[in-house]
């Protein structure tokens, strides 16, 4: 039964039904909304109209016998099979235990939007708990073995780890005016490796809370690409502790809400699924004096989380510091997160770390701005790709990358994160306090733009870790350490990374940037385009982009700014590379980012330039051109000389009329050269098609009949055995083009029908002319002579009879 009447629900049901479902089954599935006895007639009518629009937008109705089926449209057929598959049931005794908790959001707040689609996480095991997107519930599946995981520790002490089960949930209801203070930081990583695995929350308020001491989440073994949560010192769950939460948590039993959350995109061990996970980390609850009016805390908190990740990636351990130095408003300390350096992959977004000595304190993070702080990469339906064309996608990425002209981000491809032209521009760093907007991502698009870090962080071993990731995934991420006095900054070159822009705050931006992965050939740096392009259209376009670019920002001339665009045929098609491409590539070897796209860009540009400047000119071989001109002009001596040197010229067609040399011979009536060319081609081993057609469908026999060259037609039929039944594009045969002066033998030779009345012979023409002359003379004699009126009636009748007998004799002959 459907839970809501929406486009996503209709598309989900059709995809789960294999793209084809009976009309009756579809109506039964949405019966709750279409035939609600408690709803008014007007509401039901609106629902029916809305339901019809939803169906017509994604499916069509087909009649098969007496049953009507609703069939998914072809553009959505690629969505079949992409729904989240049930996780395979695992034996709790052999595989251990695996805890996974999906925590609710704060009262009246959503961390994710409806536009990501309603997704369901299904678990096939009877002991597992179904997690629905409309109601945030806990999921407690089996755990992965402890020996194959590296853990992120969340808790104040390692000895107080406890397994989280439904029996630990608190039943007390809290409200925003009385925020609770939980003792742990629950973590909810995804467990599936499908592209649709995600945890989403809706606008419905959730009343769930967790009251366990500590919880830890860990990476699974390299064999399983997904992420699982695993506690230390996990105690076996009691009997009956893992039934469905839907049965254990009635309406009367509600759980408190977490005040804020942060979304971190975690890279899985599988390269193909490294950006599929989305981990929801909940910070501890604040005390009574929570302050929600501090938007400046976001940047400092992001740096705080980034420092932890860098410290863990370097040392593999940490020394926990109290949270009071960083967040004095909190009564419960924030437990650190641990990531072992032996892991093969690194999170896409840096995690958090607590620093004891900081120059300024940061207040706690409000929950209503968490969606803007962290990029949560949520997979959505591929119908976005079906609805957006390549041009729309290009425009969308341009808009998301550069923003509008009136915005403070400037214009141009590399104006997103450029530092302002102020006194601190020489430091190549920018402070997080200089921006009052939602903080930018830690992974920037350009290699020149740096993110400020604290000076007491060790960066040893950072390059080795990212180099291993670069060799495996080849996403083009390079790290360079730059130190300016007491400030160490990390610069990341993401020329091919999927995260190449700051504007990931929209709903579909993460999945769009993941789809396109590669830089397009037509989006290179301005100096590179200046070296290659020469057409007026591209020059005007480049000048227009320069005028639109804001003068407050500096332009980097040696860094290419790729605008993301799909390149799905890169491994399927092979494109020819001209020699000039290798010359340019040799001259620009030091520009590795630009040179790797140069051959493809140069070939496309060459084709575009030749098509625009020489659209009306078709290049021909000089010998072929001379052959066409000489055969059309009837220069038979030169034609036969060229044929003697290259007999294959007889096979060449005129690109306009489609005539071959045989057509020209038949048109000019050159029977001698016709015979010589045919005999010479046989000697050279070339088979000539005597029934070859021109652009209008004319064969040489048609051409000979049209121009009245009967000798050529007789030779073609008798000696060369051409097919007289071939028709041209008008549906006519060769004999239908013969004129009246053609003899009957030629008519019969070209296949004219025997019962067809052909033109009269000469004798018949003479007799008919004589008869007409006699009739005319007799009529003139009767009308013009006065003696005719004096003749008797018998004489006039006798004269008329004689003329009738004379006409009979003529026709009998």
Swiss-Prot record:
Residues 400-416 have a biased composition (Acidic residues). It comes from the Eukaryota. Residues 177-189 have a biased composition (Pro residues). SMART domains: ANK. InterPro entries: Ankyrin_rpt (IPR002110), Ankyrin_rpt-contain_sf (IPR036770). Residues 142-256, 400-436 are annotated as: Disordered. ANK repeats lie at residues 657-686, 696-726. Residues 208-244 have a biased composition (Low complexity). Keywords: ANK repeat, Repeat. Residues 158-176 have a biased composition (Basic and acidic residues). The keyword Aminoacyl-tRNA synthetase does not apply. Residues 191-202, 245-256 have a biased composition (Polar residues). Pfam families: Ank_2. Belongs to the SOWAH family. This is Ankyrin repeat domain-containing protein SOWAHB. It comes from Xenopus laevis. The gene is sowahb.
